[in-house]
Amino acid sequence: MNAAASSYPMASLYVGDLHSDVTEAMLYEKFSPAGPVLSIRVCRDMITRRSLGYAYVNFQQPADAERALDTMNFDVIKGKPIRIMWSQRDPSLRKSGVGNVFIKNLDKSIDNKALYDTFSAFGNILSCKVVCDENGSKGYAFVHFETQEAADKAIEKMNGMLLNDRKVFVGRFKSRKEREAELGAKAKEFTNVYIKNFGEEVDDESLKELFSQFGKTLSVKVMRDPNGKSKGFGFVSYEKHEDANKAVEEMNGKEISGKIIFVGRAQKKVERQAELKRKFEQLKQERISRYQGVNLYIKNLDDTIDDEKLRKEFSPFGSITSAKVMLEDGRSKGFGFVCFSSPEEATKAVTEMNGRIVGSKPLYVALAQRKEERKAHLTNQYMQRVAGMRALPANAILNQFQPAAGGYFVPAVPQAQGRPPYYTPNQLAQMRPNPRWQQGGRPQGFQGMPSAIRQSGPRPTLRHLAPTGSECPDRLAMDFGGAGAAQQGLTDSCQSGGVPTAVQNLAPRAAVAAAAPRAVAPYKYASSVRSPHPAIQPLQAPQPAVHVQGQEPLTASMLAAAPPQEQKQMLGERLFPLIQTMHSNLAGKITGMLLEIDNSELLHMLESPESLRSKVDEAVAVLQAHHAKKEAAQKVGAVAAATS
């Protein structure tokens, strides 16, 4: 099969210079007119999932891909011209340098398209790119031809030509290694000498007189500022390398006018930057090796701990070279560093001090890591989690729910911490039993829905949704976590002139509630967790029970242990008698409205009479506002009927 696949003609395009917001759908809309598209992939960062600025478009026919390359190259998508070329999966062909041309001294106005149009006359171009930064073109570019012959022809014709009134250099592309080798060879035969740290009294003539003793000089220059003042450095160019080398050997470190001068080979800016970078990396590696295994990171520090106290706490374990609490605006940031003289001392300090309470907080002590190491470690952890999820068999998610009592599904394996459970549409359908509340008291949109997938949010407030012309509110809803639900039961009960049937049954059910004891789970109830594995849950302290006269005390554990369809019933049985003492005529309506609130909030209301009264007052205000609006509408209707 591989042999057959390799014989297929190329029909894959690389699309670069993409805007970060460009998606596969946009590219499909762009490229599908050229012909049938098999697939499109925008390459993204593994962690952030942000676009990397390029994509691959695979066509069914090579002719369609070629048509797209010819007609759509440099078209604009979301304000940026795209760059299209044939996808070359073999990196050795891209990096070989065959057919690759380097152009420099370009005018800022020349972009990818202008460069492509200029050089396409010499042969088929595989890729063409002007190098840019945030300020625009950097003045150089690369053109990769299909053949070396086309590249040689372009170099011969274009090198030294004027493009936008600027003489450009066009030559064969050279790798960094080749360029460094050439610079090294030139450095060995240098003739230009750099001199610095001399006084202001030294001018061109005195500098020439000083250095001409070593051989014939071609030029001597002291560098000056716009005011003509010497900058304290200059250059001397010799005719022969031997003379320049002799000047460096004899003059470097000599004293002139009370100052010790530096004399060395004159370097280009690129060389100096490369040398400084090498020195910086060398110092960095030395520092890393020096502090490897001896520098400790301590966090969760008490605010009263300063550098001296930190040193005092860790000094029993060995010789401390430095101890520092990190500060911000003079206040402790809660972490610091302690550096020991040997790895053995640092290891002992970690063993003894990690978890020890100093001041009022337990310390976290570990070997300090560089930012790059921490980032790599976190990335590795993330990738392992992703790989573990992908390694699950296809039916793992579908089979992770086993039937429990009442036809509900509970997880057969623990869910990932902090993540909401995943349910397939079929499972959701199975999880909706016939509602216990035949009329009212349950929102239509959330009948039988387990609390694990109900959206949570801040404390709810009652709001009024567009009523109809019936005798009482057609739709009264609770705003919980940004979602509203219709109270159809209130409509039914009000149209019949009574209270909801389910609410009417609360009082009789309350009398026999104590006869039906429920299992108590060893964990605290939370609206986002349902039926976790009891073996992995820590035991909790006894929880306060909500006492309603004549009923079994209700705890969060009892509520969590009950099937979801019974939880609202249990809460309603305890809410109804409390609300009836406040507003006996509206108790049924208000109870049905309050049952839309999240279970944890309802438990809080049962424990706090002030909170319950506040919510009841809100519900009464909504009902009264609706009643007033309905009366006003009836009066308007009566007046209209009389006038007609």
UniProtKB/Swiss-Prot annotation:
Q: Annotated cross-link Glycyl lysine isopeptide (Lys-Gly) (interchain with G-Cter in SUMO2) - which positions?
A: K361, K375
Enumerate the GO terms in the molecular function aspect. mRNA 3'-UTR binding; poly(A) binding; poly(U) RNA binding; RNA binding
Q: Which residues carry this modification: Phosphothreonine?
A: T304
Q: Where in the cell is it found?
A: Cytoplasm
* GO CC terms, sorted: cytoplasm; cytoplasmic stress granule; cytosol; nucleus; ribonucleoprotein complex
Q: Where is the signal peptide?
A: none
**Positions of post-translational Phosphoserine modification:** S206, S315, S319, S531, S584
Q: Where is this region: Disordered?
A: 436-459
Q: Where is the PABC domain?
A: 551-628
Phosphotyrosine modification, residue list: Y140, Y364
Q: Name one GO biological process term.
A: blood coagulation
PTM comment: the record says: Arg-518 is dimethylated, probably to asymmetric dimethylarginine.
The family database entries (PROSITE patterns) matched by this protein are listed as: PABC, RRM
- One Pfam family recorded for the sequence: MLLE
What CDD domains does the entry give?
RRM1_I_PABPs (cd12378), RRM2_I_PABPs (cd12379), RRM3_I_PABPs (cd12380), RRM4_I_PABPs (cd12381)
Per UniProt, the keywords (alphabetical) are: Cytoplasm, Isopeptide bond, Methylation, Phosphoprotein, Repeat, RNA-binding, Ubl conjugation
Residues modified to Omega-N-methylarginine: R419, R432, R436, R454, R530
Cystine connections: none
Boundaries of each RRM domain copy? 11-89, 99-175, 191-268, 294-370
- What functional role does this protein have? Binds the poly(A) tail of mRNA. Binds to SMIM26 mRNA and plays a role in its post-transcriptional regulation. May be involved in cytoplasmic regulatory processes of mRNA metabolism. Can probably bind to cytoplasmic RNA sequences other than poly(A) in vivo.
Describe, as the record does, how this protein assembles with itself and its partners.
Identified in a IGF2BP1-dependent mRNP granule complex containing untranslated mRNAs. Interacts with NFX1. Interacts with ZFC3H1 in a RNase-sensitive manner.
What name has this protein been given in UniProt? Polyadenylate-binding protein 4
